[in-house]
Amino acid sequence: MEYQEIIKKLEFLKNPKNVEGMARFGIRPKTKVFGVPIPELRKMVKFIGKNHELAIKLFDSGIHEARILGSMVAEAEKLSENQIENIVKTFDSWDVVDQTCMNLFDKSVIAKKKILEFSKREAEFEKRTAFALMA
């Protein structure tokens, strides 16, 4: 699947009731939110496969679910320290942090080496990254 196809698919799967439910759990990102459930994102990964360049585009999309999807299709061994920093600095909800750590950063030697550094940061979601990686 190409980037534009993925975005169209996410828009098609939009679920406003899920967005309301997410808000009740404190998921109120500044990015656009479609309310696509994680199991639907996992189904999409089967068609996309691993694609690091696409993953970076998805992280940069400004769409909540696309960013989570990016964490699922990225290749941990190709992550640079600069890419990790760029991703971490854009975190705006706990679920994106947790999913990115579980799906991607946990498999990255570079990200794991930054745990102590992340734990000393002031920004809530940057600090959470450290604790999600330790869990």
Which ranges hold each PLM region?
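Alpha-helical scaffold domains
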Residues: 1-135
